């Protein structure tokens, strides 16, 4: 792994299981760290709200801050109508955040570095928003494909462009998240490998530089969870407004 910065993204089997309908369903490192991320989220929420104190402790305050943060994102982008969709938006945010942060830890695996994972998340969001759109607005939901005031002669072209833009939303969401996680981790691995090979890791400047890079990657991990969530809310606003 020290020689190949992309080795950290390799999926390998942890527990081999019998094939199911011809498909390999073995328990992989990706499954393991996804499970770890979910368990950490559950523990964070359970212990955070366990006491329900009027004057919250540090953990309860952290849970309340994350929850209020997600609510503010929803309100700012969808208005009050979007608040009924808090369960989905909060789950998406906290899951991606947990996976991203776990991936920063040494010898871990970044689940969100694989497009298949981020695309699955994006498709869940895409299908959910589409269903909500038709449920809330009916056929009127299709008006997002044709802005008001569009000349009739231009309408067919605009509809095709808007339909294409709508259908590629899950693709852009998934690639944006995966690409940013891959890029950040690869840069850290390349620089860290160079420093180790030069035998200068424990000198002050390179060591502090690596720490700063890891700190920046933590920031990117949080930022990417925020961007995914805010884009989800922007797309949701088309369905509820």
From Swiss-Prot:
<keyword id="KW-0375">Hydrogen ion transport</keyword>
<comment type="function">
    <text>Key component of the proton channel; it plays a direct role in the translocation of protons across the membrane.</text>
</comment>
<protein>
    <recommendedName>
        <fullName>ATP synthase subunit a</fullName>
    </recommendedName>
</protein>
<keyword id="KW-0813">Transport</keyword>
<feature type="transmembrane region" description="Helical">
    <location>
        <begin position="54"/>
        <end position="74"/>
    </location>
</feature>
<dbReference type="InterPro" id="IPR035908">
    <property type="entry name" value="F0_ATP_A_sf"/>
</dbReference>
<keyword id="KW-0138">CF(0)</keyword>
<dbReference type="InterPro" id="IPR000568">
    <property type="entry name" value="ATP_synth_F0_asu"/>
</dbReference>
<feature type="transmembrane region" description="Helical">
    <location>
        <begin position="177"/>
        <end position="197"/>
    </location>
</feature>
<feature type="transmembrane region" description="Helical">
    <location>
        <begin position="29"/>
        <end position="49"/>
    </location>
</feature>
<feature type="transmembrane region" description="Helical">
    <location>
        <begin position="221"/>
        <end position="241"/>
    </location>
</feature>
<keyword id="KW-0472">Membrane</keyword>
<keyword id="KW-0066">ATP synthesis</keyword>
<feature type="transmembrane region" description="Helical">
    <location>
        <begin position="153"/>
        <end position="173"/>
    </location>
</feature>
<keyword id="KW-1003">Cell membrane</keyword>
<dbReference type="InterPro" id="IPR045083">
    <property type="entry name" value="ATP_synth_F0_asu_bact/mt"/>
</dbReference>
<dbReference type="Pfam" id="PF00119">
    <property type="entry name" value="ATP-synt_A"/>
</dbReference>
<comment type="subunit">
    <text>F-type ATPases have 2 components, CF(1) - the catalytic core - and CF(0) - the membrane proton channel. CF(1) has five subunits: alpha(3), beta(3), gamma(1), delta(1), epsilon(1). CF(0) has three main subunits: a(1), b(2) and c(9-12). The alpha and beta chains form an alternating ring which encloses part of the gamma chain. CF(1) is attached to CF(0) by a central stalk formed by the gamma and epsilon chains, while a peripheral stalk is formed by the delta and b chains.</text>
</comment>
<keyword id="KW-0997">Cell inner membrane</keyword>
<keyword id="KW-0812">Transmembrane</keyword>
<dbReference type="GO" id="GO:0005886">
    <property type="term" value="C:plasma membrane"/>
</dbReference>
<feature type="transmembrane region" description="Helical">
    <location>
        <begin position="114"/>
        <end position="134"/>
    </location>
</feature>
<keyword id="KW-0406">Ion transport</keyword>
<feature type="transmembrane region" description="Helical">
    <location>
        <begin position="86"/>
        <end position="106"/>
    </location>
</feature>
<dbReference type="InterPro" id="IPR023011">
    <property type="entry name" value="ATP_synth_F0_asu_AS"/>
</dbReference>
<comment type="similarity">
    <text>Belongs to the ATPase A chain family.</text>
</comment>
<feature type="transmembrane region" description="Helical">
    <location>
        <begin position="200"/>
        <end position="220"/>
    </location>
</feature>
<dbReference type="GO" id="GO:0045259">
    <property type="term" value="C:proton-transporting ATP synthase complex"/>
</dbReference>
<keyword id="KW-1133">Transmembrane helix</keyword>
<dbReference type="GO" id="GO:0046933">
    <property type="term" value="F:proton-transporting ATP synthase activity, rotational mechanism"/>
</dbReference>
């Amino acid at each position: 792994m020290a020689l190949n910065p992309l080795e950290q993204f390799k999926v390998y089997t942890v527990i081999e299981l019998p094939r199911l309908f011809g498909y390999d369903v073995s328990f992989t490192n990706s499954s393991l760290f996804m499970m770890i991320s979910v368990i950490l989220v559950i523990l964070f929420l359970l212990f955070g709200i366990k006491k329900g104190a009027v004057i919250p402790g540090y953990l309860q305050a952290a849970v309340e801050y994350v929850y209020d943060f997600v609510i503010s994102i929803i309100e700012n982008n969808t208005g009050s109508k979007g608040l009924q969709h808090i369960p989905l938006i909060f789950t998406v945010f906290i899951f991606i955040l947990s996976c991203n942060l776990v991936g920063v830890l040494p010898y871990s695996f970044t689940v969100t570095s694989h497009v298949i994972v981020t695309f699955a998340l994006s498709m869940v969001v895409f299908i959910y928003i589409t269903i909500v759109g038709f449920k809330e607005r009916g056929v009127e939901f299709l008006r997002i494909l044709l802005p008001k005031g569009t000349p009739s002669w231009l309408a067919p072209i605009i509809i095709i462009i808007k339909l294409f833009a709508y259908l590629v939303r899950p693709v852009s969401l998934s690639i944006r998240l995966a690409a940013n996680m891959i890029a950040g981790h690869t840069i850290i691995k390349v620089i860290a490998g160079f420093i180790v090979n030069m035998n200068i890791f424990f000198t002050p400047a390179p060591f502090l530089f690596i720490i700063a890079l890891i700190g920046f990657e933590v920031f990117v991990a949080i930022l990417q969870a925020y961007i995914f969530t805010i884009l989800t809310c922007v797309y949701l606003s088309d369905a509820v407004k």
